[in-house]
């Protein structure tokens, strides 16, 4: 995915997709929760933190994230987002063959791995 920033006299806009098949979600995490440590075979993902200060893992890198931080996740790349004392919300844009079953869970605190 190629992100485009276009400057205008009134400010700017960021374009995340252009005539591409994609699935767009805003995901809300409760405090003290986490997605599985997982990967996908058939899609890439882009995450942009909207609110909160989640802990984001992409590959071998773990980041204490803040609103506005962005992350790109390749096919087969392990990733997770988790919260501690506060909830968080993030934008997810998935490209490729999107299927909710295309999740390989490596670790999961809810017993789904």
Which residue ranges define each predicted feature?
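A short glycine-rich, His/Asp/Glu-containing loop-to-beta-strand
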Residues: 2-39, 43
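Structural motif
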Residues: 34, 46, 53-55, 78, ...
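Short acidic-glycine-tyrosine-enriched beta hairpin
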Residues: 59-78
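Short, conserved beta-strand element in jelly-roll/cupin
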Residues: 27-30, 39-56, 93-96
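Double-stranded beta-helix
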Residues: 1-8, 80-113
